[in-house]
């Protein structure tokens, strides 16, 4: 059905809605009881309405005759007295002034027109909910209000007609009565979800229709009339695909409303500031070390840091000033909240980066989620299943369900470096561990490991970890929406010691940490393991024993023998030496090789210079591999001390010429990448590296941690900005990095796109953004794969994969071919009525 063919000046008979027999409309009223809204007295001529933007005509929407008026929930509610007025805190605009409402409607219509121009051809439905008075009750309705609809969006068009039959009571207290628009209107706060299908039918009464018409990402924003500080309506954005990052949409709505002298919740862009605080820098370095050790030791998918937000005074809607922060969720107004952006984070599973992005947009108040409860109590807190929270108690619950994150542990710490500053460390346990005893065992070992790495940190509540056991708060959400907490004893386990200074080597079968003595003395005993793998799970211990039995085979292969096979792939080398690839990786780790130099190098197309660079950049047990036949001068593996003052004068850039830095940068990558393998990445926001000209020293020097923290950059995933500044200085024989462009040819279904990138500066995030922009996709909705030398499609999920991919492509040609694959999410539903259950099938 073409939208231009719809007769919007007439009625919307219920028989046009094909699903009417399958659902009970929560708001059904007769034509005689049609609520009057002055907005309906405003009409536009057909010539003023362009495209898919519509506004109701003078005649109100007509519904089939029914004798009762039901509230937004499916149960009948008692009608309030006719003379009841809403609470002044709601900020409802008085209905006695039709002219004012006509002006508001005209502004909203124009604002949606601006929004439509900014979104282009996106599949999005934007509709307005406005307050009206019906039988003495104040309700929100979208009937008779302007809306905008993307092209070829029949499902959204049908969902729009469904929304016309709904009204949400502003007098109610329950979520079912208020609905999503009602909650936003009453609280004057935005609400959004990556997928409405994560709501329960009580929280979202249109859930059955959303399932039927594939409605997913939804955002609702309050609209204010600035001169009178009144909430005049709600703008609801509806999409047919999952949505993680809503900041661009909020910005577009803000600009559209500002153009017509209206406003909504704003993104408060704070100025770029540099925090040259050595104490805070040291505290974050210690926190990042703990996150890294714990995640790699126990295979945790994600660990991150929350801190109280830096507030600033902003003009409040009711007059005066209140404190706010950078989130566009205005719930932080005047309250203490926490933010996780620009702080230490460690991600093992690359697929949960979307959850990390969502955390950067949401701020948690005291008591919200596990981190909020730990912040409130200043102690330790644990929840076995955060997906059972409601959205009010944990705003990120829908994202936790999307990314299948369940068990969560948080602890509130403070550092002697920073006085009273508080840091909340949040750890998500592996989703596969669901047994209570296994969770307790893992938690006990985790606590002991953290204790071993505490230097300046301690629990805010002064709780000390006992030798054998301790108590922590365990919270649990019940089916009735209540949250209960109790103290439970946790037995402390005693894992083996891990050195504080280490360089992590990422392999799928075993995570290991090298001793600091290895990097300091540049030597290692052949065949002797100077590290241990810590894992409290019994199954992992069995694997560990079997690996030790093969130690004799590993001792027989020396570093000199390995060097002879660097030109080929790891698989070929393993086959030639008579060992399996897994054993080959362990042999490499014993010699200090964190990454195999190359896949199968095409000696014809790759010059001797490039081969020399690849081999020389591999760090062995004796530092860089000094192959005199190819290289007269080895590459150093450490950098000189860095001065903060010099770093301020360096121009920003996006890449670092040195990647293997122990105390400066932690990046774990698999020695031999494979599709679907997990990747580990640590991040802590710092200033970018200066990369113009720099001196390469020929002697070892201790790296310095005197760097300036950048608290403003919101991109938490750019590993090239991590813990480094290089001194900008001219030299007699400078090393100049040569940049050349690589053509990207990506195929998605029947579409093919082509563009060029700089291999020296591009990251996986930037590459996915370029692909998403050209194919009009969400970055979280697809993954990239490339064809390797073995003619296998390999996933590109992190910067390490991209670097390997570019190396492979450079050995063949200057064109990199990628394949774009959709990422599917498994959505659950909680339909209560039999009719909704039918539609879920």
From Swiss-Prot:
Compositional bias of kind Polar residues: 651-662
Pfam families: GAF_NLP, PB1, RWP-RK
Keywords: DNA-binding, Nucleus, Transcription, Transcription regulation
Domain (PB1) ranges: 741-823
Cross-referenced InterPro entries: NLP (IPR045012), NLP1-9_GAF (IPR055081), PB1-like (IPR053793), PB1_dom (IPR000270), PB1_NLP (IPR034891), RWP-RK_dom (IPR003035)
UniProt GO MF annotations: DNA-binding transcription factor activity; transcription cis-regulatory region binding
Region Disordered, residue ranges: 649-682
Domain of life from the UniProt record: Eukaryota
Gene Ontology CC annotation, any one: nucleus
Annotated TM spans: none
Location within or outside the cell: Nucleus
RWP-RK domain location: 539-624
PROSITE patterns: PB1, RWP_RK
Gene deletion effect: No visible phenotype.
Annotated function: Probable transcription factor.
Stored PANTHER family: PROTEIN NLP6 (PTHR32002:SF35), PROTEIN NLP8 (PTHR32002)
Name recorded for this polypeptide: Protein NLP6
Organism in which the protein naturally occurs: Arabidopsis thaliana
């Amino acid at each position: 059905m073409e939208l231009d063919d719809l007769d919007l000046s007439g009625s919307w008979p219920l028989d046009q809605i094909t699903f009417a027999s399958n659902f009970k409309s929560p708001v059904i009223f007769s034509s005689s009881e049609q609520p009057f809204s002055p907005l309906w007295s405003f009409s536009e001529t057909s010539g003023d309405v362009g495209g898919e933007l519509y506004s109701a005509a003078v005649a109100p929407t007509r519904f089939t005759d029914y004798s009762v008026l039901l509230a937004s929930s499916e149960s009948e509610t008692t009608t309030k007295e006719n003379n009841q007025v809403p609470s002044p805190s709601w900020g409802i605009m008085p209905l006695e002034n039709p002219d004012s409402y006509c002006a508001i409607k005209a502004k909203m219509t124009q604002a949606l027109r601006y929004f439509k121009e900014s979104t282009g051809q996106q599949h999005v439905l934007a509709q307005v909910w406005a307050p009206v008075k019906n039988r003495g009750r104040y309700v929100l309705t979208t009937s008779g209000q302007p809306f905008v609809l993307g092209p070829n969006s029949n499902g959204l068009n049908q969902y729009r007609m469904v929304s016309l039959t709904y009204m949400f009571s502003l007098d109610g207290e329950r979520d079912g009565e208020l609905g999503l628009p009602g909650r936003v209107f009453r609280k004057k706060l935005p609400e959004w979800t990556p997928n409405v299908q994560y709501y329960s039918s009580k929280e979202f009464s249109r859930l059955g229709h959303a399932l039927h018409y594939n409605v997913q990402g939804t955002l609702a924003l309050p609209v204010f009339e600035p001169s009178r500080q009144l909430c005049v309506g709600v703008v609801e954005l509806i999409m047919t695909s999952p949505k993680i990052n809503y900041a661009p949409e909020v910005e577009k709505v803000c600009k559209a409303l500002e153009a017509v002298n209206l406003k909504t919740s704003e993104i408060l862009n704070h100025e770029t500031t540099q925090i040259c605080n050595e104490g805070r820098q040291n505290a974050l370095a210690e926190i990042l070390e703990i996150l890294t050790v714990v995640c790699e030791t126990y295979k945790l998918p994600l660990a991150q840091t929350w801190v109280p937000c830096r507030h600033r005074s902003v003009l409040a809607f009711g007059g005066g000033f209140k404190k706010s922060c950078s989130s566009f969720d205005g719930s932080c107004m005047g309250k203490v909240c926490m933010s996780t952006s620009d702080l230490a984070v460690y991600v093992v599973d690359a697929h949960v980066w979307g959850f990390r992005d969502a955390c950067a947009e949401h701020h948690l108040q005291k008591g919200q989620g596990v981190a909020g409860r730990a912040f409130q109590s200043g102690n330790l807190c644990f929840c076995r299943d955060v997906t059972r929270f409601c959205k009010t108690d944990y705003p990120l619950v829908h994202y936790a369900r999307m990314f299948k994150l369940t068990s969560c542990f948080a602890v509130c710490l403070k550092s002697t470096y920073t006085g009273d500053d508080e840091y909340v460390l949040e750890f998500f346990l592996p989703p596969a561990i669901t047994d209570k005893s296994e969770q307790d065992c893992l938690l006990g070992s985790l606590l002991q490991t953290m204790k071993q790495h505490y230097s300046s940190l301690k629990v805010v509540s002064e709780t000390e970890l006992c030798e054998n056991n301790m108590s922590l708060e365990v919270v649990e959400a019940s089916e009735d929406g209540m949250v209960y907490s109790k103290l439970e004893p946790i037995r402390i386990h005693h894992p083996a010691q891990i050195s504080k200074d280490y360089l992590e080597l990422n392999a799928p079968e075993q995570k290991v940490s090298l001793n600091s003595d290895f990097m300091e003395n540049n030597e290692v005993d052949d065949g002797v393991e100077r590290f241990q793998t810590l894992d409290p799970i019994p199954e992992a211990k069995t694997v560990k024993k079997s690996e030790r039995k093969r130690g004799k085979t590993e001792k027989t292969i020396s570093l000199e023998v390995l060097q002879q096979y660097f030109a080929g792939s790891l698989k070929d080398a393993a086959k030639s030496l008579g060992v399996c690839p897994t054993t080959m990786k362990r042999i490499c780790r014993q010699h200090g090789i964190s990454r195999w130099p190359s896949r199968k190098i095409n000696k014809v197309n790759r010059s001797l210079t490039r081969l020399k660079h690849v081999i020389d950049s591999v760090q062995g047990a004796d530092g860089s591999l000094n192959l005199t036949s190819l290289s007269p001068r080895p590459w150093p593996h450490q950098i000189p001390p860095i001065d903060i003052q010099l770093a301020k004068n360096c121009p920003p850039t996006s890449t670092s010429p040195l990647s293997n830095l122990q105390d400066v940068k932690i990046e774990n990558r698999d020695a031999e990448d494979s599709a679907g393998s997990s990747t580990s990445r640590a991040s802590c926001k710092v200033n970018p590296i200066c990369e113009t000209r720099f001196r390469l020293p020929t002697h070892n020097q201790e790296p310095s941690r005197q760097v300036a923290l950048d608290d403003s950059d919101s991109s938490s995933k750019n590993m090239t900005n991590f813990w480094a500044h290089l001194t900008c200085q001219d030299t007699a024989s400078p090393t100049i990095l040569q940049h050349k462009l690589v053509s990207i040819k990506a195929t998605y279904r029947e579409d093919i796109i082509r563009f060029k990138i700089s291999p020296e500066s591009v990251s996986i995030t930037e590459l996915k953004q370029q692909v998403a922009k050209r194919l009009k996709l969400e970055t979280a909705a697809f993954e990239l794969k490339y064809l390797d030398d073995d003619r296998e499609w390999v996933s590109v999920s992190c910067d390490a994969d991209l670097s390997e991919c570019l190396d492979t492509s450079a050995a063949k040609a200057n064109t990199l071919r990628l394949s774009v694959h959709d990422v599917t999410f498994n959505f659950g539903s909680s339909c209560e009525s039999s009719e909704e259950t039918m539609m879920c099938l």
